[in-house]
């Protein structure tokens, strides 16, 4: 059974108490949530429910908004894709920060704000991950120093994303070309790839195939090929009701 959306095994007791009561709407708890975001960035955890509560406080109290905290939340959300965490967080931000501003005023505001640029760059990364454009994700991430600044506070950002990509690959493939996987995981050498797939994924590297080196993924419930046969039983009594309906006179 999966963990409930509003639960987090690593959540401190004081944060849980705030989220369970009316204090979650108290602006004075903003600093507590902000410190908790810093903690998540440092210890590689992610508490979506608590982060959404902080973004909701920002929504009610725009003067309290800290741009760095918001971008850290979004960067952390990237490390748990393909969950809806990023889109949920993005939906609580001001309209002018959205990737596609809906009116002229929002578009004008978006052109003059470093914060808006940061949000939209992170949204671009999210789009690439969600659409499984992994090689383009890494090339985009490495294309601008601003991306490095936006993810600098998130400990192990690249490693966490790399693991999530591997999980998604494992759901869709039984076998994949090593060169392709190198690009998808942004591992610059064959040695690094072999070490990652062996130690992190427990996958096998096969160098004996006619098509070059391939990585073999063990069978799991997601990538297993299964033939599915569906059959439906239609009883005579079901036809009987249809026939009787045909002889009934309209009222």
Swiss-Prot record:
It comes from the Eukaryota. HAMAP family: eIF3k. GO terms for molecular function: ribosome binding; RNA binding; translation initiation factor activity. It holds the Pfam family CSN8_PSD8_EIF3K. Disulfide bonds: none annotated. Belongs to the eIF-3 subunit K family. It is found in: Cytoplasm. The lineage of its organism: Eukaryota, Fungi, Dikarya, Ascomycota, Pezizomycotina. GO terms for cellular component: eukaryotic 43S preinitiation complex; eukaryotic 48S preinitiation complex; eukaryotic translation initiation factor 3 complex. PANTHER family: EUKARYOTIC TRANSLATION INITIATION FACTOR 3 SUBUNIT 11, EUKARYOTIC TRANSLATION INITIATION FACTOR 3 SUBUNIT K. Keywords: Cytoplasm, Initiation factor, Protein biosynthesis. Component of the eukaryotic translation initiation factor 3 (eIF-3) complex. InterPro entries: ARM-type_fold, CSN8_PSD8_EIF3K, eIF3k, PCI_dom, Transl_init_fac_sub12_N_euk, WH-like_DNA-bd_sf, WH_DNA-bd_sf. Its main location: cytoplasm. This is Eukaryotic translation initiation factor 3 subunit K. The keyword Secreted does not apply. Residues 46-224 form the PCI domain. GO terms for biological process: formation of cytoplasmic translation initiation complex; regulation of translational initiation.
